[in-house]
From Swiss-Prot:
One of its GO terms (biological process) is rRNA processing. GO terms for cellular component: cytoplasm. Binds 1 zinc ion. It comes from Methylobacillus flagellatus (strain ATCC 51484 / DSM 6875 / VKM B-1610 / KT). HAMAP family: Endoribonucl_YbeY. It is found in: Cytoplasm. The gene is ybeY. Its EC number is 3.1.-.-. Belongs to the endoribonuclease YbeY family. Its cofactor is Zn(2+). GO terms for molecular function: metalloendopeptidase activity; RNA endonuclease activity; zinc ion binding. Its main location: cytoplasm. It holds the Pfam family YbeY. This is Endoribonuclease YbeY.
Amino acid sequence: MPRLAMNVQYASEWDSLPNEKQFRKWARAALRVDTEATLRIVDEEEGRMLNRDYRGKDYATNVLTFPLEEEPWLVGDIILCAPVVAREAAEQNITLESHYAHLTVHGILHMHGYDHEDEHQAELMESIESFTMIQLGYPDPYSSEKRKR
């Protein structure tokens, strides 16, 4: 089983944030290789600044991933924007815990090189996310979208 070294930083005092043990459990479930990650929970201002500075998009997004190194361990940062995650969970009528789990898995997969830039890549990444979420005991985050395709 791949090893995980994870530092969780709470830079946002948002309500109902998962604890470090939960984040580590979700990240471990998606690991493919030994990984060292920093997972940072941010407010909307920091999320917007990071998205603007690194992606050229002037809004806060739910998750950003910054892979930094590949050898000998995969190293990178995952940023979760607490207000955006909470808003999306409410809009999608899903639990906040489930949405945090999904976005943590999603971020780890991005660190591992998975992407959703074209339909084939998106289908592969989504299938891994769906499998991982079900293994963790959560609903398939794409089940309603798959029915629409």
